[in-house]
Amino acid sequence: MFFHQYTTQMKENRRGLIPILLSLVLILASCASLTKTQKGAAVGTAAGAGMGAVIGRASGNTALGAIIGAAVGGATGAIIGNKMDKQAEEIKKTVPDAEVIRVGEGIVVEFSSKILFAFDKSNLSSEAMANLDKLIVVLKNYPDTNIEIQGHTDSKGTEAYNQNLSVQRANSVSAYLAKKGVSASRLTVKGFGESLPKYVNDTAEGREQNRRVEFLISANEKMKAEAEKQAKQ
């Protein structure tokens, strides 16, 4: 779901990724015995913030790009990746209505807006609260992570209206998480409006998929420090 139905513009942007991604593929292809976590650590070492930004923009997934860009890499990154593997599996089991993808040293969790909000609204539905309650249980089990909440819309309406709506929705989710006991210091909010579609906006199905909220889950400084210490032992 994350890597199909891209717009023509996004396909053009992705051409610029080919040399970069080929380099990563060549590195990892020679390491067939690596685990998913170890491969994530290798990608983190090779990537860096610049590549993360390029990948995020070209794929229409800024959460994915930010995780790649913030990767620590090496042995420390592998330890963080192992912890993220466990958290991702727990989210998949606990929140079946969410799409969960493991990327390097982080996790992207995506909810369709129809699960969280009524059309053109920013107040959470009862179904939304039920799904977020499930996610909150897992987030509390892993307190040493930061959570960036990103709002996205389709292209219906004006850019300004959609930008404002995306921010309002992300803020609604953040406020609910904080109200339910997730530390506000872990939460940041971003709204992207219609600027980063992952799917075509020419169809009702594509527009529905573009109306989404994404969670970027990454290691905080405490987890990074502990992983670095463990890697040196």
Segments from the language model and where they lie:
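C-terminal motif of bacterial Sec signal peptides marking the signal peptidase cleavage site
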Residues: 27-30
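Short, low-complexity, glycine-enriched hydrophobic/amphipathic alpha-helices that associate
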Residues: 32-89
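Extracytoplasmic/secreted proteins, especially bacterial periplasmic and envelope-associated proteins
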Residues: 41-42, 46-53, 66, 86, ...
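Amphipathic, membrane-active segments
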Residues: 84-111
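Periplasmic peptidoglycan-binding/anchoring modules of Gram-negative envelope and division proteins
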Residues: 93-94, 117-151, 178, 208, ...
